[in-house]
């Protein structure tokens, strides 16, 4: 480790393989906490490179529990979090809309870090039991079209750095990893980011991974398509700034997106969207995010307008709600 630290202090970059070796060494307790703290601090001060991020990703996946799913093409929809907007569970709701439209979804998530209710909170609130049993996971994917992968069951490396991250109290490379360590390694992903720097970083990451992707950012700082103003979308096929009106949506008010003050209130909004009784702004935001997810799955062969209509039909027909009920039945 000492050699790596000296190189970082000299503003050198570490290779993908070196970073993977370091991560595996951390899980084997090869380094004292002081050296790990120094490593994380050096990386944060200089800025993490794509290869350094991918090296830690490789190490987390290698030391974790894999989830080998029996499907060729499925998507994960996730936001980076940390935008401090306390929105309702937009990405998670969009996942069930996408699955209701007949596509496969492998949602990877965790408990809330900066909001009232994260993906795991709202899923668990409905009585779901998290599992890493691959047979149960594949049954859920095949019969409900969607599977939920609770991060803490799979990324075993994270427990080795938990106390250090808590003590540092500033973001580290680990804050950038949660969105690219889905143990099922989906070939499609829709990622919401809170700023354009993150968009550039993950655009390079996904290009190196060779997957189909969409990255979205609302210009006013939401890590998803909020419809509160202009938003930018970057995919394998195009890069464009949209206005809500371009897609036939009214501009949303920030207060219409708030996820409530309690986990119960967040779950009620989640339910109301799937039951097609949500505020128009809440439904529209889910339709927009689900629509861009569907476009990723379709490799950009369908227009975004077509994909949003597919998502709308999933809600209006009750298919999204039926999908969620089947998911609950299989996973409770």
Predicted regions and their residues:
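Glycine-rich anion-binding loops and their surrounding alpha/beta cores
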Residues: 59-67, 87, 102, 124-131, ...
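Short glycine/serine/threonine-biased micro-segments
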Residues: 9, 77-80, 87, 107, ...
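Residues in well-ordered alpha-helical elements
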Residues: 17, 34, 51, 135, ...
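Acidic, glycine/proline-rich low-complexity segments that act as flexible tails and inter-domain linkers
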Residues: 1-87, 101, 105, 252-257, ...
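Long, low-complexity, intrinsically disordered polar/charged segments
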Residues: 71-77, 95, 99, 183-188
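A generic, well-ordered mixed alpha/beta core segment in the N-terminal half of proteins
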Residues: 79, 83-140
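Short amphipathic alpha-helical face segments that pack within enzyme cores
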Residues: 38, 93-97, 285, 289-292
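Short loop or secondary-structure boundary microenvironments that flank
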Residues: 43, 109, 192-195
């Amino acid at each position: 480790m000492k050699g790596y630290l000296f190189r970082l202090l000299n503003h050198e970059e570490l290779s993908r393989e070196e970073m993977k070796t370091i991560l595996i060494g951390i899980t084997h307790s090869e380094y004292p906490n002081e050296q790990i703290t120094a490593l994380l601090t050096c990386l944060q001060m200089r800025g993490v490179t794509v290869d350094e991020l991918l090296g830690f990703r490789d190490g987390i996946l290698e030391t974790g529990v894999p989830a080998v799913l029996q499907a060729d093409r499925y998507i994960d929809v996730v936001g980076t979090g940390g935008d401090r907007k306390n929105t309702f569970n937009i990405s998670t709701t969009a996942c069930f809309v996408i699955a209701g439209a007949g596509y496969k979804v492998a949602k990877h998530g965790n408990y809330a870090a900066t909001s009232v209710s994260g993906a795991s909170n709202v899923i668990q609130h409905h009585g779901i039991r998290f599992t890493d049993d691959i047979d149960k996971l594949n049954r859920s994917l095949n019969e409900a079209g969607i599977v939920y992968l609770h991060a803490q069951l799979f990324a075993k490396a994270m427990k080795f750095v938990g106390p250090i991250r808590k003590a540092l109290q500033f973001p580290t490379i680990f804050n950038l990893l949660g969105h690219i360590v889905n143990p099922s390694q989906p070939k499609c992903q829709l990622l919401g980011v809170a700023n354009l720097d993150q968009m550039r970083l993950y655009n390079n990451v996904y290009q190196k991974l060779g997957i189909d992707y969409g990255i979205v950012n609302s210009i006013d700082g939401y890590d998803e398509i909020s419809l509160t103003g202009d938003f930018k979308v970057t995919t394998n096929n195009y890069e464009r700034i949209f206005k809500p009106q371009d897609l036939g949506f009214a501009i949303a008010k920030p207060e219409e997106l708030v996820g409530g003050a309690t986990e119960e209130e967040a779950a009620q909004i989640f339910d109301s969207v799937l039951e097609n009784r949500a505020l128009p702004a809440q439904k529209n935001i889910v339709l927009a995010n689900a629509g861009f997810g569907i476009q990723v799955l379709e490799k950009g062969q369908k227009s975004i307008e077509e994909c949003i209509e597919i998502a709308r039909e999933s809600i209006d027909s009750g298919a999204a709600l039926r999908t969620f009920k089947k998911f609950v039945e299989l996973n409770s």
